[in-house]
């Protein structure tokens, strides 16, 4: 069966919290996964040790297990791909648009 790296939603209404899990592709979103390899909190929070007041979203991930599952053929969903690229495991799937190069035209 095909394995997926995907998000399983927990938390409450208007306060989502996700587990990054390895599960079979055809199982339900919150069914029992094969392994939980990390968590993702999409609600921006202030860092307790940062005095600038910047907000950040919390991503905790077992990098060695994520690399293992990708190595054995687990396919990340688009959202998990984006999170793994933020951590530095995968290259970004969608690159930011580059500014257009101005073409010099001869008159």
Swiss-Prot record:
Biological process according to GO: translation
Summary of subunit composition and partner proteins: Component of the mitochondrial small ribosomal subunit (mt-SSU). Mature N.crassa 74S mitochondrial ribosomes consist of a small (37S) and a large (54S) subunit. The 37S small subunit contains a 16S ribosomal RNA (16S mt-rRNA) and 32 different proteins. The 54S large subunit contains a 23S rRNA (23S mt-rRNA) and 42 different proteins.
Keyword set, alphabetical order: Mitochondrion, Ribonucleoprotein, Ribosomal protein
PANTHER family cross-referenced by the UniProt entry: 30S RIBOSOMAL PROTEIN S16, SMALL RIBOSOMAL SUBUNIT PROTEIN BS16M
GO CC annotation, single: mitochondrial small ribosomal subunit
Function according to Swiss-Prot or TrEMBL: Component of the mitochondrial ribosome (mitoribosome), a dedicated translation machinery responsible for the synthesis of mitochondrial genome-encoded proteins, including at least some of the essential transmembrane subunits of the mitochondrial respiratory chain. The mitoribosomes are attached to the mitochondrial inner membrane and translation products are cotranslationally integrated into the membrane.
Family: Belongs to the bacterial ribosomal protein bS16 family.
Gene: cyt-21
Name of the protein: Small ribosomal subunit protein bS16m
Compartments where found: Mitochondrion
Any GO molecular function: structural constituent of ribosome
Name of a matching Pfam family: Ribosomal_S16
Gene3D superfamilies from the UniProt entry: 3.30.1320.10
InterPro entries: Ribosomal_bS16, Ribosomal_bS16_CS, Ribosomal_bS16_dom_sf
């Amino acid at each position: 069966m095909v394995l997926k790296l995907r998000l399983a939603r927990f938390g409450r209404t208007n306060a989502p919290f996700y587990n990054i899990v390895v599960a079979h592709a055809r199982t339900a979103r919150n069914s029992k996964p094969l392994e939980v390899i990390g968590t993702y909190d999409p609600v921006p929070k202030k860092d307790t040790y940062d005095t600038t007041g910047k907000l950040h979203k919390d991503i905790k991930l077992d990098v060695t297990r994520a690399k293992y599952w990708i190595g054995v053929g687990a396919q990340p969903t688009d959202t998990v791909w984006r999170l793994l690229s933020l951590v530095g495991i995968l290259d970004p799937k969608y690159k930011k648009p580059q500014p257009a190069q101005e073409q010099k035209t001869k008159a």
